[in-house]
């Protein structure tokens, strides 16, 4: 199917929010893309893309940082949910590693600590669809943190569909459209036959009914 227009996306998003039953929490707005003629178990059919959403997610992702020294200090000052030093990393038990994986949406790791982070945190992060992100020692960690607060990991695991948040129900529909277009445009470039590999696009809130986007 061709990628939907801005108007088609907006119509579906407005309906998804409108038809969603009210809850006592802020619901996410989700984008679901069903694929066709793609084998998710093959290298060319496997999608794993980090995408930075230009209009944010309505609720920041929780960022944890593995670093020492100045980078650790800046990360703390910049509002990291948790900062783990090298010594603390090496002392983490499997239970502690699972707690980090549960608490943190993104784990940013100074590059010289990546090997240890992969060995210690990797087994806990992997099953949750999360990955440690390498950060060069000279990078501005606060800027990197701020970028990842609005980042999503788009992946299809072993199923021919992808599902991700594009924001929250209280966001401007125009902003949700821009986020959805950003994701769909990137996805189109990663599929073997582009938009021809897309069978269906659906939007919904956390607890609401699915609304199919007409393309």
From Swiss-Prot:
Write out the GO MF terms. Answer: rRNA binding; structural constituent of ribosome; tRNA binding
Family assignment from sequence similarity: Belongs to the universal ribosomal protein uL1 family.
Spell out the subunit comment: Part of the 50S ribosomal subunit.
Protein's job: Binds directly to 23S rRNA. Probably involved in E site tRNA release.
Protein name, please?
Large ribosomal subunit protein uL1
Recorded GO cellular component terms are: large ribosomal subunit
> Which UniProt key words apply to this protein?
Repressor, Ribonucleoprotein, Ribosomal protein, RNA-binding, rRNA-binding, Translation regulation, tRNA-binding
Name the source's superkingdom: Archaea
Pfam families xrefs = Ribosomal_L1 (PF00687)
Gene Ontology BP terms:
regulation of translation; translation
> Gene3D superfamilies under this entry?
3.30.190.20, 3.40.50.790
């Amino acid at each position: 199917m061709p990628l939907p227009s801005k108007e088609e996306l907006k119509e579906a998003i407005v309906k998804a929010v409108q038809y969603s039953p009210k809850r006592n929490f802020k619901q996410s707005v989700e984008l679901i893309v069903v694929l066709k003629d793609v084998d998710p178990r093959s290298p060319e059919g496997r999608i794993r893309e980090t995408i930075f959403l230009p209009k944010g997610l309505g609720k920041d992702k929780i960022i944890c940082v593995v670093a020492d020294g100045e980078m650790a200090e800046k990360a703390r000052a910049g509002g990291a949910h948790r900062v783990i030093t090298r010594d603390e990393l090496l002392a983490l038990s499997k239970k502690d590693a699972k707690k980090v994986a549960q608490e943190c949406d993104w784990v940013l790791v100074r590059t010289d600590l990546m090997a240890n982070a992969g060995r210690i945190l990797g087994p806990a992060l992997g099953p949750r669809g999360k990955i440690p992100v390498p950060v060069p020692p000279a990078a501005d960690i606060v800027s990197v943190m701020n970028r990842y607060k609005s980042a999503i990991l788009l992946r299809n695991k072993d199923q021919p569909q992808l599902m991700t948040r594009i924001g929250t129900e209280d966001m401007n529909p125009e902003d949700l459209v821009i986020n959805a277009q950003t994701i769909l445009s990137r996805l189109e470039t990663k599929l073997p036959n582009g938009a021809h590999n897309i069978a269906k696009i659906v939007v919904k809130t956390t607890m609401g009914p699915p609304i199919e986007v007409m393309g």
